[in-house]
Amino acid sequence: RQNIYGARTIAGLTVDAIAGQIPELGKYVRHYDYVVAQDGTGDFFTVQEAINAVPDFRKNVRTTILVRKGTYKEKIIIPESKINISLIGEDGAVLTNDDFANKKNVFGENMGTSGSSSCYIYAPDFYAENITFENSAGPVGQAVACFVSADRAFFKNCRFLGYQDTLYTYGKQSRQYYEDCYIEGTVDFIFGWSVAVFNRCHIHSKRDGYVTAPSTDQGKKFGYVFYDCQLTVDPEVAKVYLSRPWRPYAQAVFIRCELGKHILPEGWNNWGKKEAEKTVFYAEYTSRGEGANPKARAAFSHQLKNLKGYEIETVLAGEDGWNPVKNGNRMVEVKR
């Protein structure tokens, strides 16, 4: 008789043997180093336990973790030493918590925006697929679902759910890539310092307000770039700006995006900072939909004539030539 761990091992060996005999099946086989399951059928009950088990600074190989279907209420931290992690979710894998900025910590102090996050990602070369990152605190002020400081972070088919300040792109030297993701929130729910690309994402506003609040550092060539994204709202929402500048050198560019009628004609807001109009870079390229109104846009914004210099591989290249579009599959390969 085999227990669940032995059964999984035998199954894995069997699949490997079949794939070895029929090589064309190999591309459909995905190996997992750890499995997280609430019902005890995996290696760990919680995601944090699996993260903690990953060897520090495991180079030249990825550690792949499968998260079984379920709602995991945890405050997850992926420290800088846990490099090259792939977190893969079954349908219905939700990582959630309900902290918020004005909630008190054990010392009676406010947690603050940064302290409110449900998940913190510091380790470079992190990959997540089919995971829901959620802050379930509701409309109580700042309540971050995911705080990303990692460089070369790649999110595919993930969901980011919250209200105010859902996605905090925190790392000043961080490059982040979001592909086919869903992000919802209120106020300016995508915010921070990082260079971040959103490709074919669905961006959903739950209240009037702003989609983004970049805090791009002076001298940075890029900030936020949205490619072929769809911007939608709840039925009662009618007045949303594409962005307002958290810091004076904020950058946000929307390329070929479908803008709903909730996007105001002026499109961009200066957050009451007239001087920032001279230093921000806000731009669009062939926006479409009822919210596309290039002639009425704020005078300090731009309409790009072409996309030279705004290729995804250019925006994210940095000094190491990172190109998640070309090399994305390497993010999920596991050496045997």
List each model region and its residues.
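Histidine-centered active-site loop/cap adjacent to the catalytic His
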Residues: 1-24
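Sequence-level preference for short, compositionally simple segments enriched
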Residues: 25-336
